[in-house]
């Protein structure tokens, strides 16, 4: 893997810097590095493809070296270099695609394609120039089972989940109380609602709670917490749990009271915040517990317009609603996760779809992330680490 990264890095630098008019002295070190790559690859043969619709291609390396000059690089020099660069880039692209479409239930962190296995040979180690990539570093840690942490800016840790629970219900569905939520990616939105606006609740207050268990532990998380759930702030028709009827939800938004958020690890509270919004920090957690209240305003605090919205008896045409939004902006995870700010999952999925790669023993059809993270396993983690690393290498050359 580190050889593939070095190839890609060298080719990227060469494509960017070996241009007509450049002083040779400014790129002499790069050209020496480029020539070392050519010397190492010359005389070798590789084969890529042969899975799904990815065509089989044979690669033979027999290229001349770039010479020295005391002057600027001229058009002939650059054209010679460009021909070599283009062939090498095409080769790296195909090696990456060949690797991205393969998977294995055992030792999925190791190269799976014949071409990358061959590049892992000792004689190609002379190509190693710069392995400072975060992906390469973490791939090596995972390969040696020495992982200490993998950083993502916005980890897609929540499988998609959109549903509701009713704490009070009737066949007519005209006086409901309960909770509805939408969890996806790195965001939770949850709303508590009461058609009667807590008219008969103790102290005219309804208590709501939403608990989310993560599939992997997160640490050092920067989180945004807002006293609103905008996705549940407009009218909608909702299917009943048994699918036999529908009910009408017409929210009027209140600000939540007595908001408390707990971050737990193995059942123990690690961080606890009360009535605090904006940016918060969670140190170490695998479970999030959100609790909040809907409080009916005292009659003397209601203007006539507000009192008309929430009568003391049915029918209840407007439904008191409170909500919260929790968004993980950044966190460290000891497992490999898709990241909202990166394109690795999209790159891997696109290549697998483009070449009609058959469903293998590890990944779900279409690389469905909700399925993948819901049933996350060590085998999936190993394979994800490998294909994401290859995707990051490919993205250096292929946009």
UniProtKB/Swiss-Prot annotation:
Amino-acid positions noted as binding Ca(2+) in the UniProt annotation, renumbered to this chain: 266, 286
One GO-annotated biological process of the protein: fusion of virus membrane with host plasma membrane
Family per record: Belongs to the rotavirus VP6 family.
Domain of life (superkingdom): Viruses
Subcellular location(s) per record: Virion
Pfam annotation, one family: Rota_Capsid_VP6
Miscellaneous remark of the record: The VP6 trimer contains a zinc ion located at the center of the molecule. The zinc ion is not essential for either trimerization or transcription activity of the DLP. Zinc-depleted VP6 has an increased sensitivity to proteases.
Record-given protein name: Intermediate capsid protein VP6
InterPro entries reported in the protein's UniProt record: Capsid_hemagglutn (IPR008980), Rotavirus_A/C_VP6 (IPR001385), Virus_capsid_a-hlx_vir (IPR008935)
Region called Interaction with the inner capsid protein VP2, residue ranges: 62-73
Post-translational modification: The N-terminus is blocked.
Function statement: Intermediate capsid protein that self assembles to form an icosahedral capsid with a T=13 symmetry, which consists of 230 trimers of VP6, with channels at each of its five-fold vertices. This capsid constitutes the middle concentric layer of the viral mature particle. The innermost VP2 capsid and the intermediate VP6 capsid remain intact following cell entry to protect the dsRNA from degradation and to prevent unfavorable antiviral responses in the host cell during all the replication cycle of the virus.
GO MF term (any one): structural molecule activity
GO CC list: viral envelope; viral intermediate capsid
Binding-site positions, Zn(2+): 153
Species whose genome carries this gene: Rotavirus A (isolate RVA/Equine/United Kingdom/H2/1976/G3P4[12]) (RV-A)
Coiled coil (residue ranges): none
């Amino acid at each position: 893997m580190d050889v593939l990264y070095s190839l890609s890095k060298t080719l990227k630098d060469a494509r960017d810097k070996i241009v007509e008019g450049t002083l040779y002295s400014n790129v002499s070190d790069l050209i020496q590095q480029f020539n070392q790559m050519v010397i190492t690859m010359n005389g070798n043969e590789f084969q890529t493809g042969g899975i799904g619709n990815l065509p089989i291609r044979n690669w033979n390396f027999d290229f001349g070296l770039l010479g020295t000059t005391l002057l600027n690089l001229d058009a002939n020099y650059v054209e010679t270099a460009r021909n070599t660069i283009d062939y090498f880039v095409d080769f790296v692209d195909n090696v990456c695609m060949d690797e991205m479409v393969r998977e294995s239930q055992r030792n999925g962190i190791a190269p799976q394609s014949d071409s990358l296995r061959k590049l892992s040979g000792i004689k190609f180690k002379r190509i190693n120039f710069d392995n400072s990539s975060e992906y390469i570093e973490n791939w090596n840690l995972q390969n040696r089972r020495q992982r200490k942490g993998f950083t993502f800016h916005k980890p897609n840790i929540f499988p998609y989940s959109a549903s509701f629970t009713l704490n009070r219900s009737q066949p007519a569905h005209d006086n409901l109380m309960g909770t509805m939520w939408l969890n996806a990616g790195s965001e939770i939105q949850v709303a508590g609602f009461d058609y009667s606006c807590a008219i008969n609740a103790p102290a005219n207050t309804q208590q709501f709670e939403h608990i989310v268990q993560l599939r992997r532990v997160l640490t050092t998380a920067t989180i945004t917490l807002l006293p609103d759930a905008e996705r549940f702030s407009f009218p909608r028709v909702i299917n009943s749990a048994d699918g036999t009827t529908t009910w009408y939800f017409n929210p009027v938004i209140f600000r939540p009271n007595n908001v408390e958020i707990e971050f737990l690890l193995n059942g123990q509270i690690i961080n606890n915040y009360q009535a605090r919004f904006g940016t918060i920090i969670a140190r170490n957690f695998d479970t999030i517990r959100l609790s909040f209240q809907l409080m009916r305003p005292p009659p003397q605090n209601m203007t006539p317009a507000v009192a008309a919205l929430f009568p003391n008896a049915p029918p209840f045409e407007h439904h008191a609603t409170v909500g919260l939004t929790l968004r993980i902006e950044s966190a460290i995870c000891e497992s490999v996760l898709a990241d909202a700010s990166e394109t690795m999952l999209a790159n891997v999925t696109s290549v697998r779809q483009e070449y009609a790669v058959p469903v293998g023993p590890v990944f779900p059809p279409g690389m469905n992330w909700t399925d993948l993270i819901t049933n996350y396993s060590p085998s999936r983690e190993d394979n994800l680490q490998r294909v994401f690393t290859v995707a990051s290498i490919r993205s250096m050359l292929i946009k």
